[in-house]
Amino acid sequence: MTGSAADTHRCPHPKGAKGTRSRSSHARPVSLATSGGSEEEDKDGGVLFHVNKSGFPIDSHTWERMWMHVAKVHPKGGEMVGAIRNAAFLAKPSIPQVPNYRLSMTIPDWLQAIQNYMKTLQYNHTGTQFFEIRKMRPLSGLMETAKEMTRESLPIKCLEAVILGIYLTNGQPSIERFPISFKTYFSGNYFHHVVLGIYCNGRYGSLGMSRRAELMDKPLTFRTLSDLIFDFEDSYKKYLHTVKKVKIGLYVPHEPHSFQPIEWKQLVLNVSKMLRADIRKELEKYARDMRMKILKPASAHSPTQVRSRGKSLSPRRRQASPPRRLGRREKSPALPEKKVADLSTLNEVGYQIRI
């Protein structure tokens, strides 16, 4: 969820302050508008936030805009900003080590290591999202952004955490990942949040980042998808938030070079207008469908199976004359012999060779 409190202890260096910073491969000119253009809401809970579109190193416009926003929303305002920016010495922030999977680790331990890494990066309270996430971008491009997150080691928000979680869990086929989005209502405003749902060995859990510990990672202990969603809903109630909508996407493929975008909202539930029994029914049906899709893709699109049924993959051959047209020419005495001869020209998959 987006927040308005400022955390000024983990701020990036401005352009030119650190020569080793990498330039983003998808950098674009900065817009002067407050809207960042990211797929994540630019105004969440009535609070505007900005998106860094200049890549790294951060340009002067984005840098100054961030500090102006912090000065407006922080309780000590400009005094605090001036104390930091005019300080003669600032401690160098530590760069956490990216977790590495070891064969001795269990899946829950590996997921916990990933979540601990995200927590070390910290949640971004500056009001400026450092990494632009365009939801319709191909998965390969989003994985490049995730690599950039590990290089820059800056605080992240919920949407960035989902992309980073996908990147760090790649190569573990037993772990299925899918996005879960929430739209909630509190004190006259709507809020948006997203986490990365996890399914492994018949259990559900999640990875993510939030200002609230109960609204990010969940242990891999939930037997059903509905149990996981209801646990999030109960956590929201602790903060007097009413969950209005829940959106669930499809499993994200374990192919970092895929040009396929992430499916963010395959299932949309207006949970505020539904009974829990109906919500559970819809969620469990959807969960079964997702699990079946894991088992079916290889067979559902297999050319071998389609051909074994005598069906052609070619549209032209599928339009061949039906047997009924042969019946119209039964007057010709040579037709039956010709038909037998034609059968010898069929290959093993039922295609007729025409000369």
Swiss-Prot record:
Induction description: By VEGF.
Basic residues compositional bias, start-end: 11-26, 308-319
Effect recorded for residue 134 to A: Slightly reduced tyrosine carboxypeptidase activity
Known outcome of mutating residue 210 to A: Reduced tyrosine carboxypeptidase activity
Primary location class: cytoplasm
InterPro entries: VASH1 (IPR028131)
Key words, A-Z: Carboxypeptidase, Cytoplasm, Cytoskeleton, Hydrolase, Phosphoprotein, Protease, Secreted
GO cellular component, one term: cytosol
GO molecular function: actin binding; metallocarboxypeptidase activity; microtubule binding; tubulin-tyrosine carboxypeptidase
Keyword Hydrolase: yes
Documented EC number(s): 3.4.17.17
Residue positions where Phosphoserine is found in the record: 302
Tree of life domain: Eukaryota
Active site positions: 158, 193, 210
Catalytic activity of the protein: C-terminal L-alpha-aminoacyl-L-glutamyl-L-glutamyl-L-tyrosyl-[tubulin] + H2O = C-terminal L-alpha-aminoacyl-L-glutamyl-L-glutamyl-[tubulin] + L-tyrosine
Localization of this protein: Cytoplasm; Secreted; Cytoplasm, Cytoskeleton
Subunit structure, as described in the record: Interacts with SVBP; interaction enhances VASH2 tyrosine carboxypeptidase activity.
Entry similarity comment: Belongs to the transglutaminase-like superfamily. Vasohibin family.
Function summary: Tyrosine carboxypeptidase that removes the C-terminal tyrosine residue of alpha-tubulin, thereby regulating microtubule dynamics and function. Critical for spindle function and accurate chromosome segregation during mitosis since microtubule detyronisation regulates mitotic spindle length and postioning. Acts as an activator of angiogenesis: expressed in infiltrating mononuclear cells in the sprouting front to promote angiogenesis. Plays a role in axon formation.
Name of the protein this chain belongs to: Tubulinyl-Tyr carboxypeptidase 2
